[in-house]
A protein has these predicted regions:
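Conserved catalytic core of nucleotide polymerization and phosphodiester-bond processing enzymes
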Residues: 1-230
Length: 230
């Protein structure tokens, strides 16, 4: 088994990837397709990855379980979730069960899904989606704050896609420094506690558990780490 087979599952686990998504990704790999009973092999490996990755990324697994628990508590009271990122962007995490409407046409029956804010919250989607949505919102906040800083420094040309930051070659050193500084500023704050405080304020009647305790990582090391920015 080579690194490529485990890479995607490992990288997407912090985003709340599901067993089925890992399985589907493995089914597309040449190494799996070359095997007899490739689909069974893909599912076997997917289950092993789901079991093993949390044993290696222990703290990430704890945070994911905590987020899912909090999302489940709120969703079971038929409520969505809202929070403000460190960049000031308001995020709404609200998946509602659509209303199904069957329409008979001349030659077939069409099933139409109608979405509105009167439908009940979809608990499963709320729980499954919270990790990815929070992580993406924090990634976006980091990018927004980095761009604001660079703009203030006079940079006007950007090529940004999610976690890929691009500027002209002459500005790369400045980008290197600024994106590190903004990352440190964001994560020097108690991000999970701030997130929970917002939820507790919005849902005062609910008992939401405290986040996992933080470790002893010195976030300031990001400023001098040679491999943080590549």
């Amino acid at each position: 088994m080579d690194r490529e087979l485990a890479k995607n599952a490992t990288m997407t686990t912090p985003y709340g990837v599901t067993l089925r998504t890992i399985y589907k990704g493995l089914c597309e790999k040449d190494a799996i397709q070359a095997l007899k009973d490739s689909e069974k092999c893909a599912m076997y490996l997917a289950k092993l990855l789901v079991e093993c990755i949390p044993q290696v990324a222990v703290e990430a697994g704890r945070i994911m379980e905590w987020l899912r628990e909090v999302a489940g508590i709120i969703a079971k009271h038929n409520r969505g979730m809202m929070w403000v990122t460190p960049a000031g962007f308001v995020v709404l995490h609200e998946n509602r069960k659509p209303k199904e409407v069957r329409l008979a046409t001349a030659d077939r029956m069409i099933l139409v899904y109608h979405h509105d804010d009167k439908q009940k919250i979809d608990v499963r989607k709320q729980v499954d989606g919270i990790v990815a949505h929070l992580v993406h919102s924090m990634d976006a906040a980091h990018m927004m704050r980095t761009i604001h800083r660079l703009y203030a420094e006079g940079i006007r040309h950007f090529a940004m896609v999610h976690d890929s930051y691009g500027v002209h070659a002459c500005d790369v050193d400045l980008l290197n420094r600024v994106l590190r500084e903004e990352f440190v500023r964001i994560y020097s704050e108690p991000v999970l506690q701030n997130f929970l405080d917002q939820l507790r304020k919005a849902h005062p009647g609910l008992s939401l558990p405290d986040p996992p305790q933080t470790g002893d990582l010195d976030i300031q090391q990001v400023l001098s780490s040679p491999y943080f920015f590549a």
